[in-house]
Amino acid sequence: MKVLILVLLGVVILQAAPIRKVENLLPTRNPPQNELVYWCTYANQCDFCWECIHGICRNRIQADWPVIHQNDWIINCTVSRWNGQCHYYEGSQQYLHHEMDCINPTSHTYPHTEYMKIYERDDL
């Protein structure tokens, strides 16, 4: 009986303990390279997710995204992580703040993708 109680107590403790500790990340405009997939899924309009050459931009992470013209849809962002909460701040003048549980990410794509200026071959 005591063994059963100890086993059950151990299971409860293991379930209550966090499985993975995520390190804090101070506010940055350049998240670590190994975290770009995460941040660019969460905040895909951030400038660190795009590579722009001569006004034509490609998404660095998501190859299936369209090639777009460099425009206001791509914005400056600052990202951070503290105590399991992930944050990103969009814009350089007036910040919009988004927050989520890092383990359960939610995309906050704003402005919506219909504001992207998709590059067409006829645009040359």
UniProtKB/Swiss-Prot annotation:
Query: What function does the entry list?
Result: Plays a role in virus cell tropism, and may be required for efficient virus replication in macrophages.
One Pfam family here: v110
UniProt keyword annotations, A-Z? Glycoprotein, Signal
Q: List the disulfide bonds.
A: none
Signal peptide position in this chain?
Answer: 1-16
Q: What is the lineage of its organism?
A: Viruses, Varidnaviria, Bamfordvirae, Nucleocytoviricota, Pokkesviricetes
Which residues does the record list as glycosylated?
76
Family in the record: Belongs to the asfivirus MGF 110 family.
What name does the UniProt record give this protein?
Protein MGF 110-8L
Give the species. African swine fever virus (isolate Warthog/Namibia/Wart80/1980)
